[in-house]
From Swiss-Prot:
Organism field: Deinococcus radiodurans (strain ATCC 13939 / DSM 20539 / JCM 16871 / CCUG 27074 / LMG 4051 / NBRC 15346 / NCIMB 9279 / VKM B-1422 / R1)
Lineage, opening ranks: Bacteria, Thermotogati, Deinococcota, Deinococci, Deinococcales
UniProt pathway: Purine metabolism; IMP biosynthesis via de novo pathway; 5-formamido-1-(5-phospho-D-ribosyl)imidazole-4-carboxamide from 5-amino-1-(5-phospho-D-ribosyl)imidazole-4-carboxamide (10-formyl THF route): step 1/1; Purine metabolism; IMP biosynthesis via de novo pathway; IMP from 5-formamido-1-(5-phospho-D-ribosyl)imidazole-4-carboxamide: step 1/1
Entry-linked InterPro entries: AICAR_Tfase_dup_dom_sf, Cytidine_deaminase-like, MGS-like_dom, MGS-like_dom_sf, PurH-like
A GO BP annotation: 'de novo' IMP biosynthetic process
An MF annotation (GO) of this entry: phosphoribosylaminoimidazolecarboxamide formyltransferase activity
Name this protein carries in UniProt: Bifunctional purine biosynthesis protein PurH
Amino acid sequence: MTKRALISVSDKTGVVEFAAQLQQRGWELLSTGGTFATLSGAGIPVRQVSDVTGFPEMLDGRVKTLHPAIHGGILARREAGHLGQLAAQDIGTIDLVCVNLYPFRETVARGAPDPEVIENIDIGGPAMIRSAAKNHDAVLVLVDPADYALALQDEVSPAERRRLAAKAYRHTSEYDAAITAYLSGESDELPTQLPEHLSLDLTRTAQVRYGENPHQPGAIYRWGNARGPVIDAQVVAGKPMSFNNYADADAAWSLCQELAAQEQGAVCVAVKHANPCGVAVAADVKTAWERARDADTLSVFGGVVAVSQPVDFGAAQSMKGTFLEVLIAPDVTPDAVEWFAAKKPDLRVLIAGQPQGVSVLDVRPLTGGFAVQERDARPWDDLCPEVVTERQPSEQEWADLRFAWAVVKGARSNAVALCKGGVTVGLGAGAVSRIWAAERAIANAGEAAQGAVLASEAFFPFDDVVRLAASAGVTAVLQPGGAKRDPEVIAACNELGISMVFTGSRHFRH
């Protein structure tokens, strides 16, 4: 009995060569629309699906393969009962289904209007794929050109057939998830209300050597059609990115961009293990980098750096004496790239990608599920800061408090930041008590704490932090407020002659 293959693909990579090989092996080929035109144009004998169904394509191609002559041939078990039913209807079996789907994701990604996006929701393709995958014992299902060579073997094992079926269902599942995400994104309920059902449409974009540690496999995935500054960054110099490099670069860039939106000048953020360790703003990138580096030279070693303005040759040279893992910037001049490649060949130098379609959701894995929330993207201008002490902050202290607030918001809780003149002088992050975070920040600052301001991402349960800060020379404090002992903390500030500002906005980060 002659074997039959149905080929209908949007991605035509390798399809002519594959079809030619099948035809040479005696297969009868069926096809539709553009694929039929491609194959027949290449001189390959092929029948139109409409010749098999006896029914023309209709509704501008929306209905082509949704017919018993097609799905009966795919779904029939190769046993007497099913084959007899096919014979009674003069339907032949279909032994191979090679289908990939309308380019829905790509259509969304290029910003096509809604009617065009909707028209690129494939109906017949997923139906054929799912039918073939269900009957994979008898039907080979191919959704990836990488599997064409396998299908040309004399025998395909049951295990390989099952693998191809699983791959096919994954293909349609991801496709449906992309459609769901698109349609849900148009809902008036988002982003102010989390949906009852949330699909994570993830596509692997990079394979890394391992995850956080060598014994953990790891990879980088794209969520839907989103584009990000780090996952879509251009690596212009240095080694391939690691799992930890991606995580730290994303944290550094996020904080850098938040500060750049509220500060005048160039911003530099140095990060270690997703926590800021040196942050500064200055007139140019070179100066901002030098100030951020000098804020904590010990912790910056082996860190990841993000800057808000292009890196030129002079800025590149100023990084010569410090070992860094990653530098990410909006641009890097060609002479700076050449210098990095020659003088710091291990440094990964990234030109940030342009964010597009980024979800407002922050998704954290739990055992058996996910914790989902809206991202903490509240800007300073949304706050209503209130001075709650007798002493008012000076103009410079206000500027430093605003700067410190953004920095501490980007650190892991419990977190305290000391800042002065647009640079961090002491940081304490990831502490299990607030006083320990303050002690670490103040110890890190040393004499630079004199005249600095202090910001905390959450309230003070006691007056111990403000007393410690005042003893180190801190002159102004910022915190959300809202603790039971707020009156005691305010009284301590008045007693010590320092200012305190309540923001009314907590910023835990776990």
